[in-house]
Amino acid sequence: MHWYRKILNQQVSGLHRSNLKNQGQFAKKRIANGYEQPHNVKYWSIGNENYGAWEIGAKEADEWSRLVLESAKMMKHVDPTVQLSAAALNDPNWNLKLLQKAGNFLDWISIHVYFDGLQNVFDYAPSDYETMMGRTGKIAGSISRVRGTLAMLGLEKKIKIAYDEWNPRGWHHPGIHTNLGYGLENDEYLKVRDKNDTNSTYTMADAVFTACFLNECIRNCDVVQMANFAPMLNTTGPIYTYDGGNVKRST
């Protein structure tokens, strides 16, 4: 269990450094580096997509829920004012185990959604307008499943939903999850990946889908209280910057 304790210590050390005035070695290191006052960071997320095999540190639901519980207990002990979220997804089974174990220590449930699976294909071909409009029907169901799990456990008044990563498009990086890269050399792979930057492919489909997603969040604003478009700049972001200026994409 030494590795387990080490993970917890690493998580809490960041909170010490950020939010404590002068207690402990990490707060003192912050002061020594020129930041006398604490940063008082309010929102902290435990983990990132730890349900996914593409993540280093992926966990099964039972193991993950235990790690979240112990992390949250330690972090709340260090600073009871912080707001904590934990990596989850639109899967009632995963969320149920997480919330049953750690729900009393969490303030948010963190969900990432990308609706056009460009991360899974080699050829860069964003879905057409009709396909994306068909996918708007998945938005309400995505929210209602999570809301239902919270309600079942009596946590709908305590825990809010944070879509702290969402985008109509997945990230186009073919083969990166499997480390295969389709046999491409580095320079070839980068050319394929950089097709994300092709501004002409961002169309009204992106804009309308984005509007539908945000409207559904507003309809459920009693529980959905965070929705962060990811990324904001370049790649699949709504703003593309280059040496000559910037492009505001249709999103």
Predicted regions and their residues:
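Active-site catalytic pocket residues across diverse enzymes, especially alpha/beta-hydrolases
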Residues: 19, 102, 150, 221, ...
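Solvent-exposed, flexible loop/coil residues
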Residues: 43, 118, 133-137, 236-237, ...
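Alpha-helix capping and helix-loop boundary segments enriched in small/acidic/polar residues
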Residues: 3-6, 55-66, 97, 130-137, ...
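N-terminal catalytic cores of secreted or lumenal carbohydrate-active enzymes
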Residues: 1-124, 144
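A compositional/structural signature marking long, glycine- and acidic/polar-rich segments
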Residues: 117, 121-198
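Generic, ordered loop/turn and secondary-structure boundary motif
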Residues: 27, 55, 130-133, 233-234, ...
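Aromatic-lined carbohydrate-recognition surfaces of secreted/lumenal glycan-active proteins
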Residues: 26-35, 68, 72-95, 137-169, ...
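Aromatic/acidic polysaccharide-binding cleft in carbohydrate-active enzymes
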Residues: 162-251
